[in-house]
Design a protein with these regions (language model features):
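Active-site helix of classical SDR
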Residues: 123, 158
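Alpha-helical segment proximal to the catalytic Tyr-Lys
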Residues: 128, 171-175, 235
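Short C-terminal tail/terminal secondary-structure segment
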Residues: 147, 227, 238-249
Length: 249
């Protein structure tokens, strides 16, 4: 039996990238996984298919986790399918980099609505469903919150908020045996990184030069930490932020 046998996990933004990698890793350890996606049903169902083909259990549920009504429905469908919740991975998020003179209200609110408000509302609903035995909430932050590169003031502020929220919710939810921790990745090679043009060229070379390990990360560099935080291996760990950056300083 895997480390997460008989556990139920919701992973937001799990149709690709880091979220998909975490969803598959949790399922491989025995968890029943709710693969949340915002827009691409095909991508969500592809992740579910991969999990089921390897003997795991999963369903795909559409929800825009910046909207309360969608979040409520996400957890209602989780309860209907599996009857409970043990693990939440707050992975859904967006990033739009811009210098100060290009910041707009839309750029600010779109990122804060999903990366911060969405994370809070999702955590609120998850905490209602997690039972008296407790559980684990895992927030996906970013190494940018401490690296502070130029042109990331809005995105970096959302992820600094995640750092703070992680510690605060750990204190609020600790009496209910709900642990709250954060994983702050460095640059990870995902579909989004490729689409943004960061996976090749000078930007990638600069990150690789700054990395102690001399490379950017892959999704399977992040998922083992998520499994650890979801399992009883980390039963005395809460309120912590774990940087998984390949030594980016």
């Amino acid at each position: 039996m895997g480390k997460l046998a008989n556990q139920v996990a919701v992973v937001t933004g799990a149709s690709k990238g880091i979220g998909a990698g975490i969803a598959k890793a949790l399922a491989a350890e025995g968890a029943s996984v709710v693969v949340n996606y915002a827009s691409s049903k095909a991508d969500g169902e592809r992740v579910v298919k991969e999990i089921i083909e390897k003997g795991g259990k999963a369903i795909a549920v559409q929800a825009d986790v910046s909207k309360q009504a969608d979040i409520t429905r996400l957890f209602a469908e989780t309860k209907k399918a599996y009857g409970k919740l043990n693990i939440l991975v707050n992975n859904a998020g967006i990033y739009k980099f811009a210098p100060l003179d290009s910041i707009t209200e839309e750029l600010f609110h779109s990122q804060f609505n999903l990366n911060v408000l969405g994370l809070l509302l999702t955590s609120k609903e998850a905490a209602k469903l997690i039972g008296p035995d407790g559980g684990s909430i895992i927030n996906i932050g970013s190494g940018i919150s401490t690296m502070l590169p130029p042109n990331t003031s809005v995105y970096g502020a959302t992820k600094a908020s995640v750092d703070a929220i992680t510690g605060i919710l750990a204190k609020e939810l600790g009496p209910r045996k709900i642990r709250v921790n954060s994983i702050n990745p460095g640059m990870i090679e995902t579909e989004g990184v490729h689409a943004a043009g960061f996976a090749e060229g000078d930007f990638r070379k600069r990150i690789e030069a700054q990395s102690s390990l001399g490379r950017i990360g892959q999704t399977d560099d992040i998922s083992p930490t998520a499994v650890y935080l979801a399992s009883t291996d980390s039963k005395y760990l809460t309120g912590e932020t774990i940087r998984v950056t390949g030594g980016l300083l």
